[in-house]
C-alpha cells in the first residue's frame, strides 16, 4: 500500500486574520499567517501556473472595472442638467404613498423647486403644510419644505412644468375629467399608476388623453421595482420611463435621476404598462401560494409560468420581449411577488390563508391594483386569443368562482406541455 502523501509546509505569509486556502491537485494547504510579515505580491511562492493565472485574472478584472468607471465618469461629465435647471414647478396628483414618495424625491432634486401635491383629504393637506408630514402614509418621515399640499386643482396645476399622476387607475378617468379645464394641453403627464381600467381595458396612456379630451397630451409611463418606503429612505432604486417621444423621455430622465435613483428610458410604452399592470395580478397568485404554505418549488413554478403568460400577452399586444425581461417586467415581478411590502402579495397571502376578499379590502387603507386588474385579464386573454391559466385563476378566485385549493388542483392537472 502506498504511503499517504503529506503536503509540504509552505512558508507563505499573509497579514489577514484568516489565511487563504490554496488548492492544487486536490490537496488544500492552509498558509501560515504572521502579523509581523507582509510580503510583496511577487514574493508569494507556489505553483507557477496557478499564481500566473490568478494574477492575469485579477489584472483583467481591474482593467475592466477601471474602464467602466472611466466610461461612467465621462458620460456623467457630459450629462445635461438643463431640464432640472429650468423646471420651476412640478405637480403631483394624489396624496398616497407613492405620490408622496415621488413628491419628496423631486423636491430634493433642487432647492427652490416648487412641488405641489393635489390631495383630497384636508387633514392630510394641513399636516403636510404645517408639519411637513403626510400623517396618513408617512407620519415618521419629514417632507422637504418645498413640498406644498393643496385641495385646489386650479392652483396646483397653474404654471406646472411637469405632472406626476399618482391616482389609482380605477378612479383616474373621473378624477381627470373633473380637472380637465385646468390642465395645459402641453403639460407632460408622468404616470405612476399601474393597472388596467376594468370596464374598458384601457391603460393609463389611453385613459389620460381620453379623459382630458386631448389626444396629444404628452405622456410618460414611470415603472419598475420600487416600494415607496424605500424611495422615501433614499435607498438605491432603478426604474424606467417610457414614452413614444424620445426627447420627452430623456427630459424626464434628467428630471428624476439622482445618486440613489437610476432612470432608464424606453420607447415601449405598451410593454412597460402591461407588465406593470399584470405583475400585480401575478403577485396575488404568489401570495396565495405563500398563504397556503405550498413551498418554494411551487412558488418558483408559479411565478415562472406567470412571467411567461405576461410575455405571451404583452407581445401579442405589440410589446417588445426585452421589455418584459427588464426593470418594468422581471424586475417589478420579483419585487412584488417575493417581498412582503407588496400590497397585492399581501392580498394573496390572506386569500390563501382563508380570509374573504371583502374582509381583506375593508381592512386595507391603500388600493391593491391587482384586484381590479385581474377582472380585465379574462377579457384580454379572449381578445388576443392567449391562454393565461395562472392569471385567469386569480381572476376566478377574486370573483369567488374558484377556491385557492381547487385552483391549485386545476393548474397542476393542466396538460403536460413543451416549454416555449
From Swiss-Prot:
Transmembrane residue ranges: none
InterPro entries noted in UniProt: 6-PGluconate_DH-like_C_sf (IPR008927), 6PGD_dom2 (IPR013328), G3P_DH_NAD-dep (IPR006168), G3P_DH_NAD-dep_C (IPR006109), G3P_DH_NAD-dep_N (IPR011128), NAD(P)-bd_dom_sf (IPR036291)
Effect of loss of the gene: No visible phenotype under normal growth conditions, but leaves have decreased levels of hexadecatrienoic fatty acid (16:3) and increased levels of oleic acid (18:1).
The entry's keywords: Chloroplast, Lipid biosynthesis, Lipid metabolism, NAD, Oxidoreductase, Phospholipid biosynthesis, Phospholipid metabolism, Plant defense, Plastid, Transit peptide
Protein name in UniProt: Glycerol-3-phosphate dehydrogenase [NAD(+)] 2, chloroplastic
Family per similarity comment: Belongs to the NAD-dependent glycerol-3-phosphate dehydrogenase family.
Main localisation: plastid
Source superkingdom: Eukaryota
UniProt-listed PROSITE patterns: NAD_G3PDH
Localization per record: Plastid, Chloroplast
Gene name for this UniProt entry: GLY1
GO MF annotations in UniProt: glycerol-3-phosphate dehydrogenase (NAD+) activity; NAD binding
Binding locations of NAD(+): 94-99, 171, 194, 228, 343, 369
Alphabetized Pfam families for the sequence: NAD_Gly3P_dh_C, NAD_Gly3P_dh_N
Residues holding substrate: 194, 343-344
Organism: Arabidopsis thaliana
